[in-house]
């Protein structure tokens, strides 16, 4: 049975209370990968995977998840500024559907609007060369996406319950 693909909050309900999450930023040529600590407080970069065949990319992601005892994935979903989903979002959803067939770890979708732009501005501000930026942008975007998701989950978990 394929893994569930859900909005972040619904996916979080499927994940155990503790355990690392793998954050993914699907670029056009690469996949940025980040990982959280088991308590889900901090995202750190893992690597940038250069797109090859889907099965090879998926095998690498599953290996990384296994090495880190991950309990789920957070996949950046590139929503347009008006809230609609364009071709990149459709491509991301197709990747998620195909990847879900290979794992039972729930996949949470997280709005990644402007993540790459924010990361690029930060790298430029830190005087990172254009060549170096091209090599690390998707990994840094994966960190940005995963950290945003972790922060959102922390806020929701800290909110007083009304039930």
UniProtKB/Swiss-Prot annotation:
Major location (coarse): cytoplasm
Any one of the GO BP annotations: rRNA 5'-end processing
GO molecular function per UniProt: nuclease activity
Keywords, sorted A to Z: Cytoplasm, Hydrolase, Nuclease, Ribosome biogenesis
GO CC annotation: cytosol
Source organism superkingdom: Bacteria
InterPro entries in UniProt: RNaseH-like_sf, YqgF, YqgF/RNaseH-like_dom, YqgF/RNaseH-like_dom_sf
EC number assigned by the record: 3.1.-.-
Localization terms from the record: Cytoplasm
HAMAP family reported for this sequence: Nuclease_YqgF
Similarity field: Belongs to the YqgF nuclease family.
Function summary: Could be a nuclease involved in processing of the 5'-end of pre-16S rRNA.
Name of the protein: Putative pre-16S rRNA nuclease
Protein's organism: Rhodopseudomonas palustris (strain BisB18)
């Amino acid at each position: 049975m394929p893994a569930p693909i859900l909005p972040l909050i619904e996916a979080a309900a499927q994940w155990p209370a503790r355990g690392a999450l793998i954050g993914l930023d699907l670029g056009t040529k690469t996949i940025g990968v980040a990982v959280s600590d088991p308590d889900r407080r901090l995202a750190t970069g893992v690597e940038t995977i250069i797109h090859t065949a889907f099965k090879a990319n998926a095998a690498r992601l599953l290996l990384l998840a296994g090495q880190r005892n991950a309990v789920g994935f957070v996949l950046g979903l590139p929503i347009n500024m008006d809230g609609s989903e364009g071709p990149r979002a459709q491509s991301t959803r197709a990747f998620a559907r195909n990847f879900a067939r290979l794992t039972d770890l729930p996949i949470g979708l997280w709005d990644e609007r402007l993540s790459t732009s924010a990361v690029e501005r930060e790298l430029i501000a830190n005087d990172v060369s254009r060549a170096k930026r091209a090599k690390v942008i998707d990994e840094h975007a994966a960190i940005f996406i995963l950290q945003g998701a972790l922060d959102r989950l922390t806020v929701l978990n800290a909110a007083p319950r009304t039930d």
